Amino acid sequence: MLSAQVAIVRFRRDVLISRVARVLLFVLLVTAVAAGMGDSEGGWERGIAGGGMLALLMGFFFLQGYRDLKSSRQAADWPAMIATGRFEQAERQIDLSLRSFSIYRRAKLLGLHNLAMLRHAQQRWDEAAILCRAVLDQQVAMARSLAKPSRLLLADSLLQVGDLAGAYEALSRLYSQRLSLAEAMTLLQLQLEYSWRVGAYPAMVSGLAAKVQLAELMPTSSAARTQAFLSLAAHRLGQKELAGWLGQRVKLLVDPERFKVEMPAMVELWNEGSV
């Protein structure tokens, strides 16, 4: 199994090598063009040599671009593999992507991000957090496009290991950003879990109607968990009727007995007869 530290070391090494390779290729390209423009004695021979070198370089760039595009297309399948539990297949492909050479960084960065997703799905929270931070450390356009999903993964991983300060920092960087609907739903779930852990119950029920509406758009398990947090917050604030209404909505979505295992705090609420 590929460890987070090994993957990051490999990624950083390959990024350094690709930078050096791009510089060397640029020097060769300039040399080839200069040779092709030679007009002194023997210039036509240098022109042929320069033209041949230029053709080889263009072929190399084309091949690298094709391989990068192919790797990026393969990477598009990894989230589906992870979501359906095909962890070994996803890991093999990610490992191959991180091992292959490319002068471009995009496929490597996608591999690192998807490895973070895989470790998160496997509940290996510490490794997921390390990988997310490695992605966020990259100051390139591709990394910026992965910043929001990486921060959401980072926040959840840190919540699971009890690092509330780190989770808050990750979440706070998302508040001022424009999020997709899926990202907004994930952020709401993380906000509620964080607020529950720190006892910020009034903040949890603030804007309740909008939160319930957003929960209705979520997958069943996420909708149940979101409304369960809202129900618990209302209960802690003494709003029994609201807590009961939200708790009943949770019961309509999931099996209460199984859900008590996932969220033991609901046992107290349901056993009291508030719901």
Q: Which residues does each predicted region cover?
A:
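TPR repeat positional signature
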Residues: 74, 112, 151, 188-191, ...
